[in-house]
């Protein structure tokens, strides 16, 4: 077959097996077949020569099904009869490799289209686009594997050890359990990203990553939570969200007993007990266990705030802070108290709130003995003893313990009253004052005195009552 004289089709590069032939192949031979066929098909698609309807053999391979055909289908596919029977022998991986290299033409850059190279940021080498199992990627794998002599670089001296053999990347020394995973990893070193999104132009090294990314462009959110109505683009995100409602935490840390909803979270947490803080900030000398945490921390020093709210323009250092902030605009409060069902926008707030019901005051001031439900309240309280008031008004010079108090104070200068009661229209400078005011409309008085039974709308009123009346 001369590929240069005509259009390459998937039929030109397809090898079919009967059920009997397929069953004689061992797992590593089947994996090799899958790698070659999927890689060739993806290369055809990437240059616009793939079929509009995905071939049945590719569908089967992607779904993990066995791709064998009935014997008459195989004979009718144009494959030579001498290749229709493997003679009962069990092929070695090397034999399968050589046979597939003969039967499945290499789809290289000359066969498809002439493409320019790309420059790898890591090595500054110009590398060809259009990787397939037989041509440029195979060459790269062979040059970066840990053994000698061609295909044995991947499988070792004994081809039967291919399955389960740990393959090593010479560039970063990372180990892999299968050849396909090593190949996928090597694309990163080679800066090869053949799968491009037609909507935004972003490119990916693996097709499944492109498929996942393309869902972010679609407005459709097909996976909906039956409890709260939240919708998600991916089913895995819905499963993760639903654990919030069930409070299921099956994975427990063996060292401290802390429980997690996800196994990966538990594994990452356990590293805290073992790992050294080997990543140090050269600005403040603070140390971290993970390099990713150090990178995030450095943004504090640079002032970089890459995550901006599209509603109000406010920018944040961390994406998680932006997500929390956006709930102010949407009014979303996904975290409910299990006792009184009060809803909160942040998980940490509901955890702190539930401590009010238990009465647990775990944080004690070592100077005066006052106890607090929340650690942040203890930190703020200690400033009373030190006299520290780090937040100063730039208009009148008045200083405050808390930044929130400074913001509230500055509104007295501007006259801004941003919090309005929906019942009577009265406006307030502070959100706290609006919350207290609303209770006059509802008549709600949840804080009862244990001594006389008198009820109050706010906890501060109850505390003041107990000090004035019952502590005499």
From Swiss-Prot:
Zinc finger residue ranges, C2H2-type: 167-189, 195-217, 223-245, 251-273, 279-301, 307-329, 335-357, 363-385, 391-413, 419-441, 447-470
Pfam family, any one: zf-C2H2
Keyword Cytoplasm part of the UniProt annotation: no
Main location: nucleus
Annotated keywords: DNA-binding, Metal-binding, Nucleus, Repeat, Transcription, Transcription regulation, Zinc, Zinc-finger
GO MF annotations, alphabetized: DNA-binding transcription factor activity, RNA polymerase II-specific; RNA polymerase II cis-regulatory region sequence-specific DNA binding; zinc ion binding
Cell compartments where the protein resides: Nucleus
A GO CC term assigned to this protein in UniProt: nucleus
Gene Ontology biological process terms in this record: regulation of transcription by RNA polymerase II
Domain KRAB: start-end pairs: 8-80
Function text: May be involved in transcriptional regulation.
Entry's family note: Belongs to the krueppel C2H2-type zinc-finger protein family.
Name of this protein: Zinc finger imprinted 3
UniProt gene name: ZIM3
